[in-house]
């Protein structure tokens, strides 16, 4: 397994699942919580710009003179063939070798985990102190971890002790003497029992992390995670001088043109340049602009996870020679200082989009205030038309509206008239009651004494004003308005449910799209489309289906309306579909059959959309 100081941290295929899982678990712990590797067979985007940055640890100027030599896109769509978890024997630092195949839809991969059962693994990790790495000291182990990870000690002895044998990531065995002694009594690896030799050989220093695992069969394995200031770049034993700069790009270009497999080396502490397809698409859907707020996760010098917020101050190419590259395309400004260095330019998939809490609270407050106003006006007008205490008149009786004392009385009367005629927030007891009977000039005073008060905009409608100027007939207000702004009083009244539905239709532009078997949802803007053709094309791009939705051999597109009914996309004219659709689902044919059997699926008389029903230039139906 050894090759120029390079060790494969994965066992051969003949090794049982327990040992394989222990290797992967130990490697992942040593790599850190921020390291995310793709899975074999997964679709990814490979960014050569990030690969060069990792290998060369170069500046932007050094990257600039490489790109013009080769005709290579800023990103390559690939599929993962295999992943080898490796460790550098000289430093015990872990890294991964990822095998990629450019632009292929099907790749045969070796399934090294035939059993889906996850073995039980106990582990602990400890940041080493000065006492732990001193020649005269030993490794002190917390009691809880010693009980979980080590065989039980014989407590009947004056000094409980046992000898343990553990293997490192590349299979070398090390012996440690585990004792339980001292005042107070503690579990520890003694310096004379092998720990001192181990610490010296591995060149352990303060801040390194010692990780130990115990499998179901009692096997012990350990790894080392170097302190932040001691972590280096890709080991020179892994990448020879011939593979630097031009060699890396040349090998990728050759693989891209010949459609053959190529390998890339990934170090956990570096920026991720092999990105999952779903993660990339989800990041691009955020539409980051200047001024957008974000949060990014880091690992501190003490290996604790930290999150820092910032603001995007620029969106552009990091290098002029890599046009339209998303690699570090966001120039950022951080809110606060940090004890470690942070990048000034980041990639969209490395950050989390934030919506300012102040904007959320203000938006919700405005919406709440708006609905409160409408509800109050609706309740007042409903009382105005239904209460019998005002003069004990029927609904056919004429009514006058007091004049408003502030200057915008005409505009407010316009609002009131529109509210009465268009929003229909009041209850209508008589179907034959028309708007001409609703609003008439006042011809007589109300003589019946009111028993209750009814306020409209702070004015008591039950009190009879003695001033002639206090009454402004609606007709006079309407005459003062321009001809083109007069309201049509013959417009039919609509129910509150219709009004509410209309208002929601105007505010809903982006709706969620869920695909069966895909964890991450997408969002589409129906207002930016002109027909079903564009919708299907957009969905195929988002989920990488390649005409599978148009042919309808495997998938069907379903949507839910405001009432939760599930219907096939294509049964309704495009404008009606845009108004009704609340969520879109891409389901398999089998799932549609199950929905029909459970009577959960609503089928109108017309058939669903097929590829033949949609001509190439359909725009609105």
UniProtKB/Swiss-Prot annotation:
Residues 508-600 form the PB1 domain. Its main location: nucleus. It holds the Pfam family AUX_IAA. The keyword DNA-binding applies. It is found in: Nucleus. GO terms for biological process: auxin-activated signaling pathway; regulation of DNA-templated transcription. GO terms for molecular function: DNA binding. Belongs to the ARF family. Interactions between auxin response factors (ARFs) and Aux/IAA proteins occur through their C-terminal dimerization domains III and IV. This is Auxin response factor 13. It comes from Arabidopsis thaliana.
């Amino acid at each position: 397994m050894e090759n120029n100081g390079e060790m494969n941290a994965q066992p051969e295929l003949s090794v049982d699942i327990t040992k394989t899982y222990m290797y992967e678990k130990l490697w992942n712990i040593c790599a850190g919580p921020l390291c995310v590797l793709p899975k074999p067979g997964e679709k990814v985007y490979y960014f050569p710009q990030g690969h060069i940055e990792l290998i060369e640890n170069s500046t932007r100027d050094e990257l600039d003179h490489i790109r013009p030599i080769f005709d290579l896109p800023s990103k390559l769509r690939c599929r993962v063939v295999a992943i080898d978890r490796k460790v550098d024997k000289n430093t015990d630092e872990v890294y991964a070798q990822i095998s990629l195949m450019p632009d292929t839809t099907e790749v045969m991969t070796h399934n090294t985990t035939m059993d889906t059962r996850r073995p039980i693994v106990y582990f602990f990790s400890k940041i080493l102190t000065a006492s732990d790495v001193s020649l005269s000291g030993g490794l002190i182990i917390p009691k809880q971890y010693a009980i979980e990870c080590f065989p039980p000690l014989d407590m009947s002895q004056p000094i409980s002790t046992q000898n343990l044998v553990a293997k490192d990531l590349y299979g070398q065995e090390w012996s440690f003497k585990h004792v339980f002694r001292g005042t107070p009594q503690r579990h520890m690896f003694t310096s004379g029992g092998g720990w001192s030799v181990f610490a010296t050989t591995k060149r352990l220093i303060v801040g390194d992390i010692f990780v130990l695992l115990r499998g179901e069969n009692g096997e012990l394995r350990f790894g080392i995670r170097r302190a932040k200031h001691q972590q280096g770049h890709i080991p020179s034993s892994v990448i020879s001088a011939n593979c630097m700069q031009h060699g890396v790009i040349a090998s990728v270009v050759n693989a891209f043109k010949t459609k053959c497999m190529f390998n890339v080396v990934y170090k956990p502490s570096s920026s991720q340049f092999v990105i999952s397809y779903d993660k990339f698409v989800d990041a691009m859907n955020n539409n980051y602009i200047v001024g957008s707020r974000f949060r990014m996760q880091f690992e501190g010098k003490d290996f604790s996870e930290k999150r820092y917020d910032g603001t995007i101050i620029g969106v552009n190419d990091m290098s002029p020679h890599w046009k339209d590259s998303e690699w570090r395309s966001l120039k950022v400004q951080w809110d606060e200082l940090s004890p470690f260095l942070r990048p000034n330019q980041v990639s969209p998939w490395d950050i989390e989009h934030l919506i300012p809490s102040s904007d959320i609270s203000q938006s919700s407050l405005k919406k709440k205030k708006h609905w409160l106003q409408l509800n109050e006006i609706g309740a007042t007008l409903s009382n105005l038309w239904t209460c019998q205490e005002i003069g004990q008149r029927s609904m056919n009786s004429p009514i006058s509206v007091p004049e408003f004392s502030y200057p915008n009385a005409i505009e407010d009367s316009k609002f009131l008239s529109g509210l009465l005629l268009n929003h229909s927030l009041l209850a209508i007891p008589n179907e034959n009651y028309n708007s001409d009977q609703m609003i008439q000039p006042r011809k007589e005073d109300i003589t019946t004494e009111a028993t209750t008060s009814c306020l409209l905009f702070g004015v008591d409608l039950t009190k009879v004003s003695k001033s002639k100027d206090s009454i402004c007939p609606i007709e006079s207000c309407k005459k003062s308005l321009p001809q083109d702004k007069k309201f049509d009083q013959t417009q039919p009244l609509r129910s509150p449910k219709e009004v509410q539905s209309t208002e929601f239709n105007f505010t809903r532009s982006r709706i969620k799209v869920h695909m069966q078997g895909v964890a991450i949802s997408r969002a589409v803007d129906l207002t930016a489309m002109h027909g079903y053709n564009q919708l299907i094309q957009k969905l195929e791009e988002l989920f990488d289906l390649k005409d599978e939705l148009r042919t309808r051999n495997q998938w069907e597109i379903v949507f839910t309306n405001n009432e939760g009914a599930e219907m096939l996309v294509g049964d309704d004219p495009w404008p009606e579909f845009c108004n009704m659709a609340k969520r879109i689902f891409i389901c398999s044919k089998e799932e549609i059959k199950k929905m029909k059997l459970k009577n959960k699926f609503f089928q109108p008389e017309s058939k669903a959309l097929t590829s033949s029903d949609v001509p190439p230039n359909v725009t609105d139906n």
